[in-house]
Amino acid sequence: MEKHRARALGRDSKASRRKGLPSAPPAGPYELGEKRPKLHLNIRTLTDDMLDKFASIRIPKGSKKERPPLPQLKTVSGSSDYSSVSSETMENNPKSLSENEVLKLFEKMMEDMNLNEDKKAPLREKDFSIKKEMVMQYINTASKTGSLRSSRQISPQEFIHELKMGYTGERLFTYLESLRVSLTSNPVSWVQNFGHEGLGLLLDILEKLINGQIQEKVVKKTQHKVIQCLRALMNTQYGLERIMSDERSLSLLAKAMDPKQPSMMADVVKLLSAVCIVGEESILEEVLEALTSAGEERKIDRFFSIVEGLRHNSVQLQVACMQLINALVTSPDDLDFRLHLRNEFMRCGLKEILPNLKGIKNDGLDIQLKVFDEHKEEDLSEFSHRFEDIRAEFDEASDVYSVVWDTVKETRAEGHFVSILQHLLLIRNDRFIRQQYFKLIDECVSQIVLHRDGIDPDFTYRKRLDLDLSQFVDVCIDQAKLEEWEEKASEHCKKFEKECTDHQETQAQLQKKEAKINELQAELQAFKSQFGALPPGTKIPLQTSAKGEPGPSAFPPAPPALGAGVPPPPPPPPPPPPPLPGMAMPFGGPVPPPPPLGFLGGQNFIPLNLPFGLKPKKEFKPEISMRRLNWLKIGPNEMSENCFWIKVNENKYENKDLLCKLENTFCCLEKEKRDTNDFDEKKVIKKRMKELKFLDPKIAQNLSIFLSSFRVPYEKIRTMILEVDEAQLSESMIQNLMKHLPDEEQLKSLSQFRSDYNSLCEPEQFAVVMSNVKRLRPRLTAILFKLQFEEQVNNINPDIMAVSTACEEIKKSKSFSKLLELVLLMGNYMNAGSRNAQTFGFDLSSLCKLKDTKSADQKTTLLHFLVDVCEEKHPDILPFVDDLAHLDKASRVSVEMLEKSLKQMGRQLLQLEKNLETFPPPEDLHDKFVIKMSSFIITAKEHYGKLSTLLDNMTQLYQSVMSYYAVDTKKVSVEEFFNDLNNFRTSFMQALKENIRKREAAEKEKRARIAKERAEKERLERQQEKKRLLEMKTEGDETGVMDSLLEALQSGAAFRDRRKRTPKLKDIRQSLSPMSQRPVLKVCNHENQKMQLSEGSRPHHSINCTSTRTPVAKELNCNLDTHTSTGRIKAVEKEACNAESNRKKEMELLGSVSKSESVPEVEALLARLRAL
């Protein structure tokens, strides 16, 4: 209430002043200047009202500035001397504070001292008396420093409220000035309370002032005051972190650089310089992006404002701009990037300004120029050092390797170079893959190293390249294989087709000869039965065997004469053995069927005597119910003696582990509910498009279309047809001509108008010309057949060869036979107890049903299980996919269409032969039809005979194969047989790929999980190490951060750490661990570090809190950026014992710059901020 009354009183007095009325006298009976008595307040009032108004004990006495009064803000009424209040109260009534009040004050004290939780924990465990004593000492100390003596304590919320009001002009300027003083004098807790919301308000005000484009003096003053408030906020670690984390802050600071306002620009440039030296490389990128955006908006170079600041007469601004240039140029670790930034500054005009700057007498400017020149010389020396040893010839790989090795050995790059070589060794030993990998690596390295477009690369892109090269490499490998194997494959295919054709033709001729032999033998038997035996003593003019015995085709001896004492002739020889499947009997009879098995009527009844030596199949009894394999069963009565299923022995694949795995995978856990909707097949009805027909076709119009499409003179077309010119005649031309040509009667009628040729239209003229050719349509039919004959042969021959070769492959493949045996074993085990149990064989079309049999968990199929078993236990089965290579092509062949095509070819040959016999003699000199067609028909008959022989042989082969596997040719066509096998082969290969991908995915997931765990472990180790580095500072002071950074920039100490990125070769001897390519730390000579050249690989460095631990922090932080290792940390800690003496020597070298500066404290602060 008192506070509200005081504000109301202030408003009334101001209102009276505006109206010309005298203001109300001050409250109380005392006049102005009269001494007031001490105000005695209870300590409880201090506890309740002043918790947020403790002053920091870190601010020295007398350093505070009196704040200017805030308009329309009334402070706490009365001027209380809190020093006397607190001291008197503590002396008179030391036990006036309750336990809760003391604990609240104790927590507030620790918060105001910026203690973390780890440091607060031991203090909370102290006795209450100790806590109370600490609180009293804290209040007493704060009272003595005068921090509790101010009468104008304003809370952060009041400042935030006033900033939200949107005041402008002098009023806003007054608020900001008061805010700057409060941010400077109040404790960190006050700054934190204001920064949560106040920072965004300050940036909003700054953005409005920058974008307002108002050049009034008060606006510039206000803008400068906002910059000063930001600087005061950044003077704490909290404020610095907030500024660096806000996206707009750096962009607005870059836009606020105005050489016309030297004082404000100096403050802006200093803040950006501090951010550059304390932030990580990402902060540097953000600063450069902010400068680039500001330059683009103003349509100037991004560094133009900085260089213009150097042209100004203000030495303070010149020093600040040189500080920012040094911070930008020395921050990147990459040498090329540093050279790029420095050259960009030179192009903007720095080269012309440097001589003038060196003529100015100023110690601070001299320090910055010296830092700039030293870093420039070191970078140029390092750059020139790259090319010192490049004097060798690069034609030989050994010479190039020697040069590269001399360049990287005993440097930090050595580990990466060895890593590159090791990775090159990991390329798979395949000549196609190796070539494509090296080609890809060469292209990537070329694009990284060379910049042929004449401009610099995008140095702002600092992220890692994550490229998925597997698909690209696969494409390159496939392309290389195709290029190399294309010629070889075509040659081998031609040779193979020729050999197969010869082989098939030879077999066909052999079969013909055997048939001829059988025919002759039949005639011989008929002759013997008709004429009887020869008289005794007759010589048989037949060829005998080598031993003088008659050959197999010799006539038998004649029977003896009646009455002779000769024994009767021996009985006839036994019948010959049954022929092979597909072969005819000796006298042309078919193979007799096996005896009927009338006793095989029952399904579950096991016959006692099975045909062809079959033995009953083993009966399996699984412990649990199994899913069924729905195959088509083949009974013994459907098999022939040489059938495949007679000889199978699937028991050799029986394995306890296999059967247990099969049982666990395909067991029936519960009755599945099937959704009937899943079985509704959507039949796609293909609508047959009706062929379009001319409703009123006109011959003249058709001929016009034909003639316009070819544009050949009519006489020339006639000559081409008479000469049978295959070079100019084409199939489409002949077909269109036959289609649109008038019939013979119309042609004869048009021949009467030869005298009126010129008066006829073009189609009629063409018809008149063509009417002179005798028997035109038979000619065109024969020519078209001749043009298409070669294509027909080339189409029929490969199809016949594909089917024939596929039949041989199916029958001869041992791996395919083993696969069928394994499937038979698995099927009998799964079907145990059902009607399909104890099966002797199954129809090959059942193989396609393997992928339809799901496992118990619905995650795999029986086909995938079979593939997995073959991979693990029976790898000799997998080659069946290659054994049946021609199965794919054979599955696309229609045997019925082959037979029709061959019959059509035979009919065309007969028709052509009849036409040649009845063709009239030629009357025109150009008529060569009979001559060319007579020679063509001879060649065509020869090819037709070969194709007929090959087709007969193919028919016998597939009949033999289907009989071999007990396939009923009446129920299953050849196309269905090959399609089923090809679908199974394709599904098997697909399942094989899916199993491989599944294993690779599982392995990849495992590696990713291990890598993630390793990365998380390393991250935790890095966090613990950073936490340890943060706790190494003994004091809890978090204020004065920006003051220390600006001091470091001004003295040049902030840039010394950047000059020690990488020592010279002889100062740091790095070795490579035999088990890893990571560098192992060795002892560093920090005394000579400054005078040596740095290497191109520049890792981040940090400076530790104390001078004795500085080298340790540097090396440790370097390793934390890559891989944290216990061995490295131990090696670094061993180095710490000798670091103090080296650090003292280094301090002597640095003393010439500024003897009064506190270098360890500055570097410790930098190290701590970088660690954060």
From Swiss-Prot:
The modification Phosphoserine is found at residues 56, 155, 1073, 1158. It comes from the Eukaryota. One of its GO terms (molecular function) is protein homodimerization activity. Ubiquitinated. Residues 493-530 form a coiled coil. It is found in: Cytoplasm; Nucleus. Residues 94-456 form the GBD/FH3 domain. Residues 541-611 form the FH1 domain. Pfam families: Drf_DAD (PF06345), Drf_FH3 (PF06367), Drf_GBD (PF06371), FH2 (PF02181). Residues 1037-1067 form the DAD domain. Residues 553-581 have a biased composition (Pro residues). Residues 1-15 have a biased composition (Basic and acidic residues). One of its GO terms (cellular component) is actin filament. Keywords: Coiled coil, Cytoplasm, Nucleus, Phosphoprotein, Repeat, Ubl conjugation. Residues 616-1014 form the FH2 domain. One of its GO terms (biological process) is actin crosslink formation. The keyword Aminoacyl-tRNA synthetase does not apply. PANTHER family: PROTEIN DIAPHANOUS, PROTEIN DIAPHANOUS HOMOLOG 3. Belongs to the formin homology family. Diaphanous subfamily. The DAD domain regulates activation via by an autoinhibitory interaction with the GBD/FH3 domain. This autoinhibition is released upon competitive binding of an activated GTPase. The release of DAD allows the FH2 domain to then nucleate and elongate nonbranched actin filaments. This is Protein diaphanous homolog 3. It comes from Rattus norvegicus.
